[in-house]
């Protein structure tokens, strides 16, 4: 279908502003500008309660935010990993999404402020997210959640971390109830139809931020073939948590996300895959669509947690 007029207007304003311009700005300035843009992308809803704390890891204290819904009907938990090409984003940039998700799922949500590249290279972010899941399971009683009802949710690079931690959880015999990778990066694919068609002019440009983000995140080219970076090429995708995979029509990552869903199905993993037409990567420029998609995901997870 045609590009949503609201999204088209957003793209015109976004490219005119030229936020990601390394001839004008230093990286830290770009990080700040993009984070400010993302934080305002969707209006924030009230929730029952939010609580900020830090998880003590072996060498680091990992910030998290715990969201309680206005109305709780189940003791499930959704672990939320934000997007941002592994180099951008924070709890704040997807605070609105966490709030919508908590209220629509009617359960607790924990958003994880994992460490970013280039300060911290792959696989630091993966293990930050995985360790947050382990911490939540170990503290299920205090959190008021069922340790056997934990789902993961993430957008873009967050979707990559969802898929990667699903592999880690399976291999470490840690049960997850569901995985929800939304417009995920699961493989550095430069040859697909969607990658070629939407590689420039649809927000997620291939040179910036995709290629730049990848180069800042990985340690060397060997990481490109590590399943924790490229879950799509993992030899075995069986026995992973059931999946809800969401893609966007005008997104260069669309085809790889749908290929991941197909491989999950082939591997016997119960999988629901749907494409949001008329929208770009992460539904930027359409707060209405972003809200609708998040509410639908929350409703599906609520049903899974029953």
Curated annotation (Swiss-Prot):
pH curve summary: Optimum pH is 7.0.
Mutation effect (residue 281 to N): 5-fold loss of activity compared to wild-type
SUPFAM superfamilies from the UniProt entry: alpha/beta-Hydrolases
Pfam family membership, one: Abhydrolase_3
Domain of life: Archaea
Disulfide bonds: none
Effect of substituting residue 105 to S: 3-fold loss of activity compared to wild-type
Family (UniProt): Belongs to the 'GDXG' lipolytic enzyme family.
Free-text function comment from the UniProt entry: Has a broad substrate specificity. Hydrolyzes various p-nitrophenyl phosphates, aromatic esters and p-nitrophenyl fatty acids in vitro. Most active against paraoxon, phenyl acetate and p-nitrophenyl caproate (C6), respectively. Also has tributyrinase activity, but shows no hydrolytic activity toward other triacylglycerols including tricaprylin, trimyristin, tripalmitin or triolein in vitro.
UniProt protein name: Arylesterase
Organism field: Saccharolobus solfataricus
């Amino acid at each position: 279908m045609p590009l949503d007029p609201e999204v088209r207007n957003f793209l015109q304003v976004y490219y005119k502003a030229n936020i990601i311009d390394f001839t004008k700005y230093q990286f830290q300035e770009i990080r700040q500008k993009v984070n400010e843009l993302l934080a305002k992308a969707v209006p924030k809803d009230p929730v029952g309660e939010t609580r900020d704390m830090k998880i003590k890891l072996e060498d680091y204290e990992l910030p998290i935010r715990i969201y309680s819904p206005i109305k709780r009907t189940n003791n499930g938990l959704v672990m939320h990993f934000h997007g941002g090409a592994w180099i951008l984003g924070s709890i704040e940039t997807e605070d609105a999404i966490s709030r919508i998700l908590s209220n629509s799922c009617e359960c607790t949500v924990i958003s994880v402020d994992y460490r970013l590249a280039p300060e911290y290279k792959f696989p630091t972010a993966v293990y930050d997210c995985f360790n947050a899941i382990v911490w939540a399971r170990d503290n299920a009683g205090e959190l008021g959640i069922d340790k056997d009802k934990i789902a993961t949710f993430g957008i873009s690079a967050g979707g990559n971390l969802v898929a990667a931690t699903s592999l880690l959880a399976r291999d470490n015999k840690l049960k997850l109830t569901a995985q929800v990778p939304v417009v995920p990066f699961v493989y550095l694919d430069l040859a697909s139809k969607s990658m070629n068609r939407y590689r420039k002019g649809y927000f997620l440009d291939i040179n910036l931020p995709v290629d730049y983000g990848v180069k800042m995140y990985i340690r060397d080219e060997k990481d490109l073939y590590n399943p924790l970076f490229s879950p799509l090429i993992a030899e075995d995708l069986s026995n992973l948590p059931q999946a809800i995979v969401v893609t966007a029509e005008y997104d260069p990552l669309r085809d790889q996300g749908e290929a991941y869903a197909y491989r999950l199905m082939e591997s016997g993993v119960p999988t629901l895959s749907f494409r949001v037409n008329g929208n770009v990567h992460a539904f930027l420029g359409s707060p209405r669509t972003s809200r609708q998609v998040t509410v639908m995901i929350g409703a599906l997870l609520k049903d899974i947690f029953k």
